[in-house]
Amino acid sequence: MQFELNAQARTLQGTGASRRLRHAAKVPGIVYGGAAAPQSIEVDHNDLLLKLKKEAFHSSIINLIIDGKKEQVLLRDTQVHAYKPLVLHVDFQRVDATHELHVKVPLHFVNEEVAPGVKLNGGLVNHVMTEVDIQCLAGDLPEFIEVDLSSLKIGGSIHLSQLKLPKGVKIVHHTADDSVVVGIVGKGGASEEAAEGEAAAAE
């Protein structure tokens, strides 16, 4: 999915200037990275807020148009109000085609309802992770990674090493362990063996 966001260069700095921007429905921000110097910007609040509600915006290359000049960036951070739907600040990082990115992308779980552990044994899906760190070139960046649960039984789980990754995408491991991504557990914590025993007794 392609996203485009218009911005203007920002020259005034400081708390007072940022407050005036917010009163004018603008969000102060910064663009950094690459060979160019960091640049302060301002973007329309409502436009940014609408885009932030879209999951793909957080893990897609964004065409940021600053005073008519296009740069490709990633959303890196947002500061939001504690209880109001207000964006207070936004950070973007420049990207290029030749340098690998390190970014979090969401996991999309499919076929949960037909997984044997759920459909046949009434198990519960336990989502241990909802996103994963990946490394890839900008052109290979996926909006999400799909996790198929169609063959998962009670007590079964899917680990990071079992994820089907798009071409050019690598998982960034933070520990030596092959962490669990998702599993199916019995309603009473039943193991796979116990569930199979109950099924055999029923037959």
Swiss-Prot record:
Family matches, as Gene3D superfamilies: Ribosomal protein L25, beta domain, Ribosomal Protein L25, Chain P
One Gene Ontology molecular-function label: 5S rRNA binding
GO process annotations (BP): translation
GO CC terms: cytosolic large ribosomal subunit
Pfam families: Ribosomal_L25p, Ribosomal_TL5_C
Annotated keywords: Ribonucleoprotein, Ribosomal protein, RNA-binding, rRNA-binding
InterPro entries found in the cross-reference section: Rbsml_bL25/Gln-tRNA_synth_N (IPR020056), Ribosomal_bL25/Gln-tRNA_synth (IPR011035), Ribosomal_bL25_b-dom (IPR020057), Ribosomal_bL25_C (IPR037121), Ribosomal_bL25_long (IPR001021), Ribosomal_bL25_short (IPR020055), Ribosomal_L25_dom (IPR029751), Ribosomal_uL5_bac-type (IPR020930)
Keyword check for Ribonucleoprotein: yes
SUPFAM superfamilies in UniProt: Ribosomal protein L25-like (SSF50715)
Family recorded in the similarity comment: Belongs to the bacterial ribosomal protein bL25 family. CTC subfamily.
Subunit composition and interactions: Part of the 50S ribosomal subunit; part of the 5S rRNA/L5/L18/L25 subcomplex. Contacts the 5S rRNA. Binds to the 5S rRNA independently of L5 and L18.
Record PANTHER family: RIBOSOMAL PROTEIN L25/GLN-TRNA SYNTHETASE, ANTI-CODON-BINDING DOMAIN-CONTAINING PROTEIN (PTHR33284), RIBOSOMAL PROTEIN L25_GLN-TRNA SYNTHETASE, ANTI-CODON-BINDING DOMAIN-CONTAINING PROTEIN (PTHR33284:SF1)
Function, in words: This is one of the proteins that binds to the 5S RNA in the ribosome where it forms part of the central protuberance.
Protein name, as recorded: Large ribosomal subunit protein bL25
Organism: Dechloromonas aromatica (strain RCB)
Gene symbol of the encoding locus: rplY
